[in-house]
Amino acid sequence: MGHRTRTFVEQGPRNKRVAALQTGGRMAGFVERTRVTKHREAYSARRQKNDPTRSSFRSSSPVVRPFSSKGRARRISGLMMALALLCFSPLPPRSTAQSAVRPYPPQPSAAALRWADEQLARMSLEEKIGQLIHIGLNASFLNQESDAFRALRRQVEENHVGGIILFRGPVYESVHLMNRLQSFARVPLLVSADLEAGAGMRFEDTINFPWNMAVAASGNPDYARRQGEVTAREARALGVHLIFAPVADVNNNPANPVINVRSYGEDPKTVARFVVAFIEGAQRGGVIATAKHFPGHGDTAIDSHRGLPVINVGRDRLESIELIPFRAAISAGVGAIMPGHISLPQLDPTVITPLPREQVIRPIYAEEGSEIVVEKATLPATLSFAITGRLLRGELGFRGLVVTDALDMSGLTLYFTQDEAAVRAVEAGADMLLKPADPEACIRGLREAVRAGRLSARRIEESARRILAAKYDLGLVQNRLTPLDMIDRIVAGREAERLADEIAQRAITLVRDDAKLVPLRAGQTLRIFNLAITNGEDRLWVARPFTAELAKGARVETAVLDERSSEEEVRKALDRATQAEVVIASLYGRVRSGQANSVGIPKAGERALRAVLGVKPVIGISFGNPYLLQSFPELKTYLVAYGDMPSLQRAAARALLGQAEIVGRLPISLPGLYARGTGIQLRKAERAAGDDVQRASPR
C-alpha cells in the first residue's frame, strides 16, 4: 500500500495546517520537547510535594536541561527563530481542550453519520479496513528518526490504523507522542486506555482510584458516578477518548484470578447499579465508556491472558446473573462493549483445537511457560457470531461499538493466527480489533477475506461507519490535539485526590475482630511488627504508604517478603515478629494479569504467616484479594482494603489507629465464613469510647 496523495478528510486550509504541523522542522520539535521538559518537571515537583512517600527512583527518567551556560546566546537566538516560525506558520488544528468537551451521546448524531458517510465515499478498501485496527503502544519519547517512531508513523500513514491503545507511560511524553501521531493521520486517531481505576492505571505520577470492589464496599453508587466523571475529564486532558471501563463482570467465583476486585461484587443487581453510575459519569465527561467482558468473565478460574476460560452454563443462568449488568449498561446508553475471550459451549458449541506450537505467537502478557491449553475448547465470545452477533447485537439490541479484547492474549493466540482471528471477529460482529500482535497480518486477512467473498465490503463499511461517527461525536474532526497546559490544570488535582481518599475511607471493611485488636489503643507504647507479603516485584516500596501513615500514631517495624525471599529472610522476619506485641500481616495478593501467582501470596510469606498465627496477636489486612481469609481462617482479626492504592493503604492505617470510622461492607461472600454485606461498623464516637460494636447484619 503506497502513500496516497488524495485527501478525503479535510480540504483546503486544513491540509496546510496539518502539513505545517508535520513539517515544522527540528527547531519546532526542540521547542515542543523543551515545553514537555518544563511541564514534566513542574508536574513531578507538585506530585512529590503532595505525596512525600514517593521515591525518586520511581519517577520518570532524569531530565537533561535544554540550556547550559556554553552557547546560551546561540541557543536563545535559535529558540526565538523557532518561536517566530511557529507564530507565523499556518495554525495546526485547535486542540480538544481549547473548546468545551461535550458529553458523549447515547446514539450517533445525524451530523456524525453524514460526515462518516462522506468519508466512506472517498475511502479505499484498505483505508476502511485500517479504521478497524487499534494498535498498542507503551508511550515514551521517540526521536523522529528512530526505527520505533518510523514504524508507528508507517502504521498511521500507510496502514491507516483507526486508533491506538496506550499502556504504561509518562504523562507528557504520552500526550506529546499522540499529538505527533495525530498530525500524521488523515482521519483523527481514536485513542484509548484501560482506566478502570483512573488515570493512574496507565499514566505515571497520576492518581489511582480504588478498585471497583472497594467502591461497591462503600455502598454508594454516586462514588462510581463521580469517579467516572473525573476519570473522563482527566482522560480528555491526556488525549484519551475511549476508556475500557467499567468492568461489568459479576465476580461469583472466589477462585477467579483475573477479575476479583476489578468487579463491583457478586450480586448482579448491585453490579448493574454501579456500572450504570460509572457509565453516566464517564460519558457525561466526554469519553466513550466500555462495559466488559461480555457476556461475563466473573465465573472463571482461568485468566484469559494465559488461556481460554470455559463457562459451561446455559442461557437461563446467564439471564439471572451475568447478563443483568450488560442489559443495564445498554439501557444506559453505553458507547462500547468488549466481548471477552471466554468459551461458552452451551451458547456456541463450535469446537476449536490448539495451533501447532510453532505457529503460536508468544503472548507478552503471560509468564514463560505459564499458558494453559485446553485441548478441545469452543469458540470464544470474541469470535462467536452466536454470542456477539445474535445475542449482543440481535437480542440485546446493542448498536454501539463492539471492541475485541486484546488480540495478543493467549485466550486467542493459542488457537488462532492473527489474520484468522481478525476475520472471525469481524464475522462475529466486532468493529474494533484491539492490540493485534501483527497488525499487518490482520489487515491482510481482512483484505483477502473481502476479495474471496468471505466478508463483504459492506460489512467492513458498517464497522468503519460506527468508528467514524464516534470520532465526530467526540469532537475529533474539529479538535484532535491535546495542549500540555491542560494536564497541569486537570490531571491529578485536588478533586481526584479527595475523591480517592473519600472512597477509600468508606471502603475499609472490618470482617472479623474476635481478638478485639481494632483500633490499636496503645499508641506509641505498643510494639508493632508489620509483616508485608507481596506477590509483585515491588518489595522496596509496596508497603510505604501504609507504614508512613501508621508511623504517625504508632511505633512500627516492617519486613517485606516476596517469592524471591530466602529462608534467612523468613527467619529474620519471624525473629522480629516474636519480639512484637502485635503483628500486622499486610497481604498484597493482587490481581496480576497473566501471572501464575495472581491474587495469591508467595510460599515464603505463607510459611511466615502460619508460623506467627497462634503465637502472637495478628491483624490481617488484605490489600488486594478479599478471599484470602479462606486460606488463613485462623486470623482472628481481618480487614479488607481491596487494593494497594496509596489512598487505600492510608485509609487502612487510619482505621487501625482509630482516627477514622470503619463502615465498609463486603460486596462478596466468603464461602463458609461470611455472607455478602458483612462488616463490623465502628463509628468515631464508638471507637473513642471503646464500646463493643456488634457485626451488622448483611444488607
Regions found by a protein language model. Name each.
Residues 8, 30, 43, 56-57, ...:
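Aromatic (phenylalanine/tyrosine) cluster motif
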Residues 53, 57, 63-80:
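Bacterial N-terminal signal peptides that target proteins for export
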Residues 121-124, 164, 173-189, 193, ...:
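Second-shell residues forming the walls of enzyme active-site clefts
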